[in-house]
C-alpha cells in the first residue's frame, strides 16, 4: 500500500515506515502531523486517483527532527566592475516517519 501526498508544494510517494524530508512544518519533535492532501492511493492492487484529492484519505506521520540543509553559496558579480555579493542559504526541513495511511 502506498500513497502520493503533497506538502510544501512538492509531491512524494510514501509507504508506511518511510522516512521523508519535507519543507519545514510548524510542529515540534515527536508530534504527529496529519497530511490531508492525498492525491492517489494504491491499496490491494487497485489505484484510486483523486480529483484533485482523494476524499477521506489521510496520512499520519511523526516528526523526528527539525533541521537545516547543507549551506549553498550564492555569488553574484559584474565583470570589470567592483561589484561582488556573496550570500549563503540553508533551507529548513522537517524529517518525518510515515506511521499510517488511512484510505
From Swiss-Prot:
<keyword id="KW-0689">Ribosomal protein</keyword>
<comment type="function">
    <text>This protein binds to 23S rRNA in the presence of protein L20.</text>
</comment>
<keyword id="KW-0687">Ribonucleoprotein</keyword>
<protein>
    <recommendedName>
        <fullName>Large ribosomal subunit protein bL21</fullName>
    </recommendedName>
</protein>
<comment type="subunit">
    <text>Part of the 50S ribosomal subunit. Contacts protein L20.</text>
</comment>
<dbReference type="InterPro" id="IPR028909">
    <property type="entry name" value="bL21-like"/>
</dbReference>
<comment type="similarity">
    <text>Belongs to the bacterial ribosomal protein bL21 family.</text>
</comment>
<dbReference type="GO" id="GO:0005737">
    <property type="term" value="C:cytoplasm"/>
</dbReference>
<keyword id="KW-0694">RNA-binding</keyword>
<dbReference type="GO" id="GO:0003735">
    <property type="term" value="F:structural constituent of ribosome"/>
</dbReference>
<dbReference type="GO" id="GO:0005840">
    <property type="term" value="C:ribosome"/>
</dbReference>
<dbReference type="GO" id="GO:1990904">
    <property type="term" value="C:ribonucleoprotein complex"/>
</dbReference>
<dbReference type="InterPro" id="IPR018258">
    <property type="entry name" value="Ribosomal_bL21_CS"/>
</dbReference>
<dbReference type="GO" id="GO:0006412">
    <property type="term" value="P:translation"/>
</dbReference>
<dbReference type="GO" id="GO:0019843">
    <property type="term" value="F:rRNA binding"/>
</dbReference>
<keyword id="KW-0699">rRNA-binding</keyword>
<dbReference type="InterPro" id="IPR001787">
    <property type="entry name" value="Ribosomal_bL21"/>
</dbReference>
<dbReference type="InterPro" id="IPR036164">
    <property type="entry name" value="bL21-like_sf"/>
</dbReference>
<dbReference type="Pfam" id="PF00829">
    <property type="entry name" value="Ribosomal_L21p"/>
</dbReference>
